[in-house]
Regions:
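Non-catalytic protein-protein interaction scaffold segments in large eukaryotic complex-forming proteins
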Residues: 1-103
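General structural signal for secondary-structure boundaries
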Residues: 4, 13, 174-175, 246
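Extended alpha-helical scaffolding segments
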Residues: 18, 183-246
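Extended, well-ordered protein cores
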Residues: 57-58, 62-202, 206
Length: 246
């Protein structure tokens, strides 16, 4: 319940949560991370009560968002408690665009915001309309808080894909710079984000240039083994779909 949730956050102090359950162990942070992950709202918990408890414990709105990203069962109640309209949508944008597994409850919530299948999202498909709506609703400053808290979603770095997609869609990166990185690293997440960067003054030319580059990337993949070829082919197909959505 909410009282336990807040007590756990008090016990954490300024310590960070441990994402990987294999590393929880018997340390203070490990035990508290395990407890936070397992803590669920009670049917009797209200947003008003959570707000009151957090205020009494001097837990900031930003810390509540971090905790809710780590333990997503608290996202919706947290949105109401702190009054951040659009938090649930923004938070689940990040959850949906990692390659972590989703339970039925999470799938149902994601389905409220996008018609794209959860498995396709996990593979790298991107709903640009969902992202833009979530970003506009929550606002740039609060979105940055969610963006930074996304590190608590997974035990790997799979949350970085959602960040790359966000940076691309917001024009925080340049197509030429991303292209250089793709050439240097053949990073599939960057490849899939490449088509999401806003088109410039000559959209038709840029669209063609990006399409041709994706085809070139696909052709180059024939230099590698069968498994890598298949993986890169899938990434190119998704990149083309994302380009078409731009």
């Amino acid at each position: 319940g909410a009282e336990t949730f807040i007590r756990i956050l008090q016990a954490f102090g300024k310590d960070t949560f441990i994402r990987d359950s294999y590393n929880w162990g018997s340390t203070k942070r490990g035990v508290l991370s395990s407890l936070l992950h397992a803590c669920h709202p009670l049917p009797t918990d209200t947003s008003e009560n959570l707000k009151k408890l957090a205020k009494q414990a001097e837990i900031s709105d930003e810390r509540l968002v971090e905790a809710a990203m780590f333990a997503p069962q608290w996202i919706e109640l947290t949105e109401k408690a702190i009054g951040w309209k659009g938090l649930t949508s923004a938070a689940y944008y990040f959850h949906a665009h990692t390659n972590e597994t989703c339970d039925d409850k999470k799938k149902a919530i994601i389905a409220r915001y996008t018609p794209i299948d959860v498995d396709d999202l996990r593979e790298g498909a991107f709903d640009i309309d969902w992202f833009k709506d979530a970003f506009k609703t929550i606002g740039k400053q609060r979105f940055e808080v969610v963006y930074n808290a996304a590190k608590y979603i997974s035990c790997s770095n799979s949350h970085t894909r959602a960040r790359k997609f966000a940076d691309a869609t917001n024009g925080a990166v340049k197509a030429a710079d991303i292209k250089k990185e793709i050439i240097a690293k053949r990073n599939k997440d960057l490849l899939m984000s490449y088509g999401l960067i806003p088109l410039g003054r000559k959209p038709d030319k840029e669209l063609l240039d990006r399409y041709q580059y994706l085809q070139k990337f696909l052709k180059e993949s024939k230099e590698f083994g069968a498994q890598r070829q298949e993986s890169e082919k899938k990434a190119v197909n998704i990149a083309l779909q994302n380009l078409a959505r731009n």
